[in-house]
Amino acid sequence: MQALVLLLWTGALLGHGSSQNVPSSSEGSPVPDSTGEPVEEEDPFFKVPVNKLAAAVSNFGYDLYRLRSSASPTGNVLLSPLSVATALSALSLGAEHRTESVIHRALYYDLITNPDIHSTYKELLASVTAPEKNLKSASRIVFERKLRVKSSFVAPLEKSYGTRPRILTGNPRVDLQEINNWVQAQMKGKIARSTREMPSALSILLLGVAYFKGQWVTKFDSRKTTLQDFHLDEDRTVRVPMMSDPKAILRYGLDSDLNCKIAQLPLTGSMSIIFFLPLTVTQNLTMIEESLTSEFIHDIDRELKTIQAVLTVPKLKLSFEGELTKSLQDMKLQSLFESPDFSKITGKPVKLTQVEHRAAFEWNEEGAGSSPSPGLQPVRLTFPLDYHLNQPFLFVLRDTDTGALLFIGRILDPSST
């Protein structure tokens, strides 16, 4: 993992010398093993089973995001990878060893020594979809018409993932309507009905849907929201509604390796959004994207410093509807679409045909209060600091309790949502 280098302009802090920000040579040093080679000790956070599982499926999510980003280099990108990972993890319940191993490697389960991943996944889902989180996330497995599904697959699926598979009727219009009705019910009407046609020769369809509307811990004053320039690149701008807070309390750092400014804003329900803003106006965020892992984001969360800044954030409302089939095939899951062994599901040969994802995400001025939490004490700076999200940026919505990646987005043009 790339080492995190976060600087808060050493020497610009009042009463906070650089020696307080840099660990001593002995502090945190790896302990040598029996061969004398240093062995990095696992962070205690990841020793908690649900957190370790969250890190694994989040790393799957970052992999999936990178593939989607490279496939759409000039547009906004929005994903809720957890809903897709959940569908895959649930499908693995019906896979024999060879096929199960393929899925588990993609989800990074091969790095987890957990005898009961699926019960831990149930705990993860209960945590991230608790009512106070404001996250709606659901996954479903849809099977071809008249398929006989074994009860030995349905029972653990319902127990760990809270869902039952759907068997198609064979009538494309009726089947699409039923799936749309299910999405509407799960998302409380927050995601539009799909007009996409059902695939003609469907065997297994995985569907992952998610919706999130953020509630800031400290709300923005809507009277300060104005139309401002958003710089698409060095030559082009668009006018978009920008929320402002001249005395925002946020967590901040500068990553000199990635040439970006990082800020973290808290949301209600023990969640936060981490923003990555390049030092120069560019639509190429590849260097930042390539660095993203669960461990890297966890390090950022530990290292950022609480400061006061002049903050501007565009109002945002994004949605995505589309197939992720090609992306999953590129993640070494091609065999699931060709000759998998799902004999724990049915006696008939079946294979994955399509993976569909629908997601919606928004934030505006709404928040829990008009002032920061009294316990937040910002570091005092000798000069004012600005953090203006008025150019292409990347954001990560993270569950603070488990570290799970819930949404990830790249915003190249907030007016094109």
From Swiss-Prot:
Residues 17-41 are annotated as: Disordered. The modification Phosphoserine is found at residue 24. GO terms for biological process: cellular response to cobalt ion; cellular response to dexamethasone stimulus; cellular response to glucose stimulus; cellular response to retinoic acid; epithelial cell proliferation involved in prostate gland development; kidney development; negative regulation of angiogenesis; negative regulation of endothelial cell migration. Residues 18-28 have a biased composition (Polar residues). The keyword Secreted applies. Keywords: Glycoprotein, Phosphoprotein, Pyrrolidone carboxylic acid, Secreted, Signal. The modification Pyrrolidone carboxylic acid is found at residue 20. Coiled coil: none annotated. GO terms for cellular component: axon hillock; basement membrane; extracellular region; extracellular space; melanosome; perinuclear region of cytoplasm. GO terms for molecular function: serine-type endopeptidase inhibitor activity. InterPro entries: PEDF_serpin_dom (IPR033832), Serpin_CS (IPR023795), Serpin_dom (IPR023796), Serpin_fam (IPR000215), Serpin_sf (IPR036186), Serpin_sf_1 (IPR042178), Serpin_sf_2 (IPR042185). Glycans are attached at residue 284. It is found in: Secreted; Melanosome. It holds the Pfam family Serpin. Residues 1-19 form the signal peptide. Highly expressed in the liver, gastric glandular mucosa and renal tubules. It is also expressed in the brain, heart, lung retina and testes. Interacts with PNPLA2; this interaction stimulates the phospholipase A2 activity of PNPLA2. Neurotrophic protein; induces extensive neuronal differentiation in retinoblastoma cells. Potent inhibitor of angiogenesis. As it does not undergo the S (stressed) to R (relaxed) conformational transition characteristic of active serpins, it exhibits no serine protease inhibitory activity. Belongs to the serpin family. This is Pigment epithelium-derived factor. It comes from Mus musculus (Mouse). The gene is Serpinf1.
